[in-house]
């Protein structure tokens, strides 16, 4: 049995009875029923995912996967490919947005080279799981072989298994890869069948002419490669990215290990979408961190049935929205575990 087939076989629905029990406890806290809104949702879902009446949230990790994209040859990004390794070094020095926000919520950042077109040597702190030096240009042929896509999925699964063994309590997804909104838009277009312009946006801030070119490139890639929406690995291999595959695998591994996973923005949700298409029960283990300004993100979230926690007009990626959302999920759990009941506080209950 391969890592992928094993993970897929272990993913099952969360326990609805546990969720109901958690809500009953929340309803007995010193507050009107339901008055803490989605914080209560986060708490009861954490109970159902972990199987614990007092879920642990102390050890939090954001995995930021880095990979390059051959489709950048088509002029789809405002930034050159060299920025990908430069940003990896920035992550490792602790100077990027994700580093700042992860520190703010007490999370660790782990940077994974899954497909950067650069030799990092023995760079301290970098997790090197390179499947290839970037994808190929999907406007000219498949981005990856099927074998490469599966290998990248299994990198993510392996990292999730390691996280479980370490006692990590809450996992976040992040990414870095110049041009990666292009494969992300291609993935949701392939699965949804929507016109490419309806799911494609400006990414790093490209202008109207570059956006029109980006749409044409995605349309050409889909027409050439004909990804099969009934075969998620085929979609991933033909128009996806290595970091997207790594994120999809991480999410599958987390679901298989009953680890809650906080999904960042557009690119991370492309990975979550692939994971959910492979096994629909995956969605039970996901928290959608935020609503990105990328137009295709809403389509992705609707398809996987996820309600975003935040809407802050974010479009950076890296795991930044996920880090922020971790703090709110942890707050919900603390309401469940630390807030007094009416009986404990000696407060009269309301008559509902």
Swiss-Prot record:
It catalyses: 5,6-dimethylbenzimidazole + nicotinate beta-D-ribonucleotide = alpha-ribazole 5'-phosphate + nicotinate + H(+). Pathway: Nucleoside biosynthesis; alpha-ribazole biosynthesis; alpha-ribazole from 5,6-dimethylbenzimidazole: step 1/2. It comes from Geobacter sulfurreducens (strain ATCC 51573 / DSM 12127 / PCA). Its EC number is 2.4.2.21. Keywords: Cobalamin biosynthesis, Glycosyltransferase, Transferase. Catalyzes the synthesis of alpha-ribazole-5'-phosphate from nicotinate mononucleotide (NAMN) and 5,6-dimethylbenzimidazole (DMB). The active site is at 318 (proton acceptor). The keyword Glycosyltransferase applies. This is Nicotinate-nucleotide--dimethylbenzimidazole phosphoribosyltransferase.
